């Protein structure tokens, strides 16, 4: 199509850069490398350096820190304070200083020392990525395929043009950094494109959806199995999204659940040892967090396939932690007040299957589920089950108002202490909405059950009612 002629040329040019530059494989001598500085307004007294290393270092009460370590690999490392990553390009032997306020440091960090030009651009690059993100994700991901592709590639053009213009004004980048930046932009675009099918279907559950046969052509020339690319921020995110995309949008056969398919796909499709270690670890971690019941089916294979001792130990620790929430275990006790002020305990619900929704009025994904939850309640109203919603709102007035104004059905409770409430701690809840199925006997059936919008929920509840 004519409107894509320029974009096609640009992508061809970027692809040439992407696949002809090999300088990231340059071998460096191990050298003492120093990263120091001051990060104010942080609540944490620990700063971590990730990349080819995993280092934790103390920060004093003023936010000052100093990391001195031996490195032999150049790349875009990540400094992490609390949950805030700060990307830093480091070459072995560098001495780099960074200052800023934790609240704005991702887009306003100040650098001094070696590779200032590259690191200043990383700050600019993160700002530009935020600026070029769509303002309305709903309308962005519900575009028709051709329009969506054009929008995404327009953003890529801006990112590529900006780094070229920056170098004209401020001098050429280090060759390794320049190559990694090209890779970063390509992987970033691929992640957005791979998100399209799942977001479109989530936002348009009533619409039929099918990708064109050529939609995934952007993956054909992308390196999916490269240890050196692990030093590029978006590569790890790309790997995980690539795995999800391949499983969801192909006819890959194999046993359910999806995590077993993912394990099989990693085993067959990846050769690099370190990449496989990371993928096995991430798939297992995701499985534990989303379905400890499924994770139990994988742990034996994981222990055989995982060659990284640190990853092996960490996953087994997670399994032990989550084992209290396995199917058949007694559901952890809770006792909270309802709208009418009466206290409802989990023991009061024995004899019926209970579908629990842990939510909050400020949680947008929670609110998206409400129409589906209402439909589910209506469809199953003649069954022997209870729909229980537990809010972790800090604002009880907002909670009461929403439940009454929306005429929400079922039993509604409010958990005291929001994220520090017992139900959050006992059920290992890190994000909401979280759905839980408890059997008539008070034992767990699924501690991380499908959402009401899921195609799986009706069959799972039907099975629970029949047990």
Model regions and ranges:
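Conserved redox-active cysteine motifs that mediate thiol-disulfide chemistry
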Residues: 350, 358-375
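C-terminal motif of bacterial Sec signal peptides marking the signal peptidase cleavage site
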Residues: 17-20
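A non-transmembrane, solvent-exposed segment enriched in polar/low-complexity residues
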Residues: 23-180, 184, 191-195, 200-202
């Amino acid at each position: 199509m004519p409107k894509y002629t320029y974009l096609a040329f640009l992508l061809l040019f970027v692809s040439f850069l992407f696949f002809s530059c090999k300088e990231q494989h340059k071998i460096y001598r191990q050298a003492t490398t120093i990263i120091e500085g001051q990060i104010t307004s942080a609540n944490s007294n620990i700063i971590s350096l990730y990349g080819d290393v995993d280092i934790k270092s103390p920060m004093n009460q003023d936010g000052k820190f100093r990391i001195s370590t031996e490195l032999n690999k150049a790349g875009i490392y990540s400094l992490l304070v609390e949950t805030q990553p700060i990307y830093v390009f480091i070459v072995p032997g560098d001495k780099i200083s960074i200052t800023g306020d934790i609240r704005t440091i991702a887009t306003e960090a100040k650098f001094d020392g070696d590779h200032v030009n590259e690191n200043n651009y990383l700050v600019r690059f993160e700002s530009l990525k935020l600026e070029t993100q769509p303002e309305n994700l709903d309308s962005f991901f519900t575009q028709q395929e051709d329009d969506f592709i054009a929008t995404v590639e327009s953003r890529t053009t801006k990112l590529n043009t900006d780094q070229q213009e920056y170098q004209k004004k401020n001098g050429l980048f280090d060759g390794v950094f320049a190559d990694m930046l090209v890779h970063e932009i390509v992987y970033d675009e691929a992640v957005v494109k791979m998100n399209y099918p799942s977001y479109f279907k989530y936002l348009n559950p009533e619409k039929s959806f099918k990708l064109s046969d050529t939609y995934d052509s952007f993956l054909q020339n992308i390196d999916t199995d490269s240890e050196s690319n692990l030093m590029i921020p978006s590569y790890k995110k790309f790997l995980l999204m690539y795995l999800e995309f391949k499983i969801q949008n192909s006819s890959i056969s194999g046993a359910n659940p999806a995590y077993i398919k993912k394990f099989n796909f990693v085993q067959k499709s990846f050769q690099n040892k370190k990449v496989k270690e990371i993928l096995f670890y991430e798939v297992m971690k995701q499985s534990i967090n989303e379905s400890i019941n499924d994770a139990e089916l994988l742990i034996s294979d994981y222990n055989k396939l995982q060659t990284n001792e640190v990853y092996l130990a960490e996953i087994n620790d997670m399994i032990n932690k989550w084992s209290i929430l396995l199917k058949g275990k007694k559901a952890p006790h809770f006792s909270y007040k309802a709208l009418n002020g009466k206290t409802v305990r989990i023991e009061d619900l024995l004899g019926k299957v209970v579908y629990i929704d842990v939510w909050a009025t400020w949680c947008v994904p929670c609110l998206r589920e409400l129409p589906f939850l209402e439909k589910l309640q209506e469809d199953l109203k003649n069954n022997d089950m209870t729909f229980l919603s537990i809010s972790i709102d800090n604002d009880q007035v907002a909670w009461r108002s929403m439940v009454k104004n929306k005429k929400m059905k079922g039993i509604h409770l409010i958990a005291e202490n929001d994220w520090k409430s017992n139900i959050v701690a006992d059920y290992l809840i890190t994000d909401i909405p979280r759905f839980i199925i408890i059997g008539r006997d008070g034992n767990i059936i699924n501690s991380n059950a499908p959402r009401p919008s899921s195609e799986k929920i009706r069959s799972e509840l039907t099975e629970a009612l029949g047990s």
